[in-house]
Amino acid sequence: FVEHEKFVDLIQYVDFIYTDLKHYNTLKHKRVVGVNNHLIIKNIHYAFAQNKTIVLRIPVIPNFNDSLNDAEEFASLFNSLNIDEVQLLPFHQFGENKYKLLGRRYEMEGIKALHPEDLYDYQQIFLDHDIHCYF
């Protein structure tokens, strides 16, 4: 997450970008992430327009963005931005210990990790929208 003007200044020095988009819906994104997604989407679009190599990732999170409707909405957004590739990151519990070490409550405690085989139908929606989608 970075202001667009700073992103424009910085991108001339960057060849490869990893970026995550956690939700297509601005209100849901802001509620969970703490910021809306307008700036993130604007920066992603700008980077693609500059022909930068980008790995756009969706962390697929249970009860947040894991429904087939969510996949449809992401795919529609990506089609509108001419984005033709996305990596799915199935939810895992790797961060749980970090929260404990920081003395913070882990909101996802007890939530089952996802695996690629859990997301084949989700992945297929992107493929049906001509978006190369992989894990």
Where are the predicted features?
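Auxiliary Fe-S-binding modules of radical SAM enzymes
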Residues: 60-135
